[in-house]
Amino acid sequence: MQIEENGQGTLRNNLSGKLAYYSFFPTPLQSLRQLNLTEETYRTLSACSRKLGELEGMLYFVPNADMYLTMYVRKEALLSSQIEGTQCTFDDLLSPSQTQLHHKDVADVVNYVRAVDRGVELLKKMPLCTRLLRQVHAVLLDGVRGTEKNPGELRSSQNWIGPSGCTIATASFVPPNIEDLSNTLQDLERFINEPQVEMDPIVRAALVHYQFETAHPFLDGNGRLGRLLITLMLINDGVLHSCLFYPSFQFKKNRSEYYRQLTSVRERGTYEEWIEFFCNSLLESAKDSVGSLKNLVGLHNRSTATITENLGRTAANGQRLLGILEEHPIVDTAFIAAQLDIGRSTASSLVKSFEELGILRPLDESRQRYRQYGYEEYLSILREDAEPIR
């Protein structure tokens, strides 16, 4: 790694002889040079704040808001994991047949969901600090691939980033050594928890995400935890009050540029370009979150009306089933019977009615027994741009 000195940090010489290598020690965020953001960046910041405010405001008027929150957390978990190469789909995540035992990628994403929930809960009890992040990391890697990488424990050895099979000498980036890591995390914690009255909270989130990714404080899971940290920062700074937002949406669509921008800050100190990219990414993600929420609410209203107008005496059970489908959009007859506490034959009749109304669709036409059904229009909204990167 070579750097053009622009206040972003220094290269540190470690060991000697054939074992010698350079690690990067980033400048503490409190000591950054004056940022010179463009007028366009300020306009994007303002637009992003307004769009996130619109999203927050919708929560007060949307029925069953908690259910939509759950789906959005799942989507963020999926998108962030896909950036790292996870091949799980949204249907995999929701399908009753794709258990964590049979699909390791599903287990990774489910753990991310649990980690988000844990982080938000911990924020109510303690400051956003290294101790909190360690607890969230322990959940993220609990019982899945990476378990051998000391979940919840800061690394005690040097790590590096580069192509598969590269050595520390040929790595494209070597994060701070152990001594510098401790100092970097202490500085980061102070920056997060000391008021920055003159700095927009979205800019703060951009800088904190960059600094965490550069510190790479764990042996595994740094990318996912770093993106989760964006949401925690926005909640911590009062921009958001919930996780009704999936910031990884645009990072995944522009994954190469996302990594290039992070690298550019380390090598050339291009903080302003990174902040502009970050703000644009969050703005586009917020726009998509608002649009999909409006579509989901519109679908709910149409489906409710369709059931009321067409199911007669079974409309009450139909409305109950709709509520179940909005939480579990992939189901089978046995699951419906158990959830509604009705007989299998009654559940089958209800499924048939929903098929005729176009609400449910069989996911596998070739199967007669144990057939699964999907709330297809609902799923299509959530699936948008959530396919794995091939």
Outline where the language-model segments fall.
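FIC/Doc superfamily catalytic core
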Residues: 1-390
